[in-house]
Each structure stands twice: as structure tokens, then as C-alpha cells.
């Protein structure tokens, strides 16, 4: 399976191919500077610098079964990601430069959805109490991000 990463210009209505790869990549998210995209593929996270597009691996420590729920904090210092472990999908917080993630979801399964604009809260969806119903939750990020 091949992937093509494109940026769509709303003003012109044109798409620009940033990267073509034989790897399956998905879920691009902007870094706050607009200079880099964060994508996932094969359970790993990658940065794609727009100035010199390439898949640059992000060190996620033990988190090697990441799904497409990931994003960079508004201040660019943190990455939140969802990764499958024994309990199911859990949410983790780690430095944007890479490193060992720390679990932040109170229960599993939990899937990250978004940062609050001020970087102090996370929105996520989760199934609780053995139910098959998915609800929306928020979680404070200690000290903000």
C-alpha cells in the first residue's frame, strides 16, 4: 500500500503533494509552527518537515502500537497519543521531541481527540463500565502544556 501526503490550499482550491511513500501513513496533524506534520504508520509516529519532506521517526519509547489519535499541544511542547496495550487503547503524554510516554487516561479504552486552545485540557472518547456506548470526556493536563 502506498500513501500520498497532500496539503490543500483553500484559497486556490489546489492540492500539493508533500510526500509519496510506499509506507501506509495516516492522520496528519499540524505542529503549531505550521512547518511540520505529525503522522502515524505501522504503529509508530513520524514527523514530516515541510521544508525537506521525509518520514522522520519520533521516539515513542515502549509505545509502538500507536493508532491515528495523536496531536501536538498548542505550545508545541507535548504530544498526546493513543496506543494499544493490554487493557486496550490508552492515552499517553510525552515531550514533543520524543521520549518515554506517561499514561494519562484513567481507564481503558480511551482515544484522544483534541487539545483545548489554551493547552490545559484534553478531549477524548471512551467506553466505560463494560458498555458498548462511547462517551466524550475531558481531562485536565496537570499544570497545562
PLM segments and residue spans:
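Short loop/edge segments at beta-strand edges and connector loops
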Residues: 19
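Conserved beta-propeller blade repeats
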Residues: 22-38, 64-79, 107-125
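Beta-propeller blade-edge and WD-like acidic-aromatic loop motif
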Residues: 1-16, 33-36, 40-60, 78, ...
Amino acid at each position: 500500500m502506498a500513501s500520498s501526503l497532500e496539503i490543500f490550499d483553500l484559497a486556490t482550491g489546489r492540492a500539493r503533494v508533500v510526500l509519496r511513500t510506499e509506507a501506509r501513513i495516516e492522520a496528519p496533524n499540524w505542529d503549531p509552527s505550521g512547518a511540520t506534520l505529525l503522522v502515524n504508520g505501522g504503529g509508530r509516529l513520524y514527523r514530516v518537515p515541510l521544508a525537506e519532506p521525509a518520514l522522520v521517526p519520533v521516539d515513542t519509547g515502549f509505545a509502538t502500537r500507536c493508532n491515528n489519535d495523536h496531536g501536538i499541544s498548542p505550545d508545541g511542547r507535548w504530544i498526546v497519543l493513543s496506543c494499544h496495550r493490554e487493557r486496550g487503547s490508552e492515552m499517553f503524554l510525552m515531550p514533543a521531541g520524543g521520549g518515554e510516554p506517561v499514561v494519562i487516561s484513567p481507564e481503558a479504552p480511551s482515544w484522544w481527540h483534541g487539545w483545548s486552545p489554551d493547552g490545559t485540557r484534553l478531549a477524548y472518547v471512551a467506553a466505560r463500565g463494560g458498555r458498548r456506548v462511547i462517551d466524550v470526556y475531558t481531562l485536565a493536563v496537570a499544570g497545562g502544556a
